[in-house]
């Protein structure tokens, strides 16, 4: 399964490891993805999402119902 946040759409970035001699080798910068269950009070059930920690902070700020409505409007 791809490491993409279901809320923010963030995914990995590609960059370089740089040695002391400034040799460059390719590497991936992975985002901090977590499985998290959120309680939806209106429906009286849990929903399980793969979200980045930044996405969790966004949900804490806006509320899960608002975020879910916003995602469904995009689709």
Curated annotation (Swiss-Prot):
GO cellular component: cytosolic large ribosomal subunit
GO molecular function per UniProt: structural constituent of ribosome
InterPro entries: Ribosomal_bL28, Ribosomal_bL28/bL31-like_sf, Ribosomal_bL28_bact-type, Ribosomal_bL28_sf
Keywords: Ribonucleoprotein, Ribosomal protein
Transmembrane segment boundaries: none
GO BP of this protein: translation
Similarity remark: Belongs to the bacterial ribosomal protein bL28 family.
Classification via HAMAP family: Ribosomal_bL28
Protein name per UniProt: Large ribosomal subunit protein bL28
Organism: Buchnera aphidicola subsp. Acyrthosiphon pisum (strain Tuc7)
Gene, per the UniProt record: rpmB
């Amino acid at each position: 399964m791809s490491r993409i946040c279901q809320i923010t759409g963030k995914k990995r970035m590609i960059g370089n490891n740089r040695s002391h001699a400034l040799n460059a080798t390719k590497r991936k910068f992975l985002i901090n993805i977590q499985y998290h269950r959120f309680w939806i009070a209106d429906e009286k059930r849990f929903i399980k999402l793969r979200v980045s920690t930044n996405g969790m902070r966004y949900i804490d700020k806006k509320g899960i119902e608002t975020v879910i409505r916003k995602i469904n409007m995009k689709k």
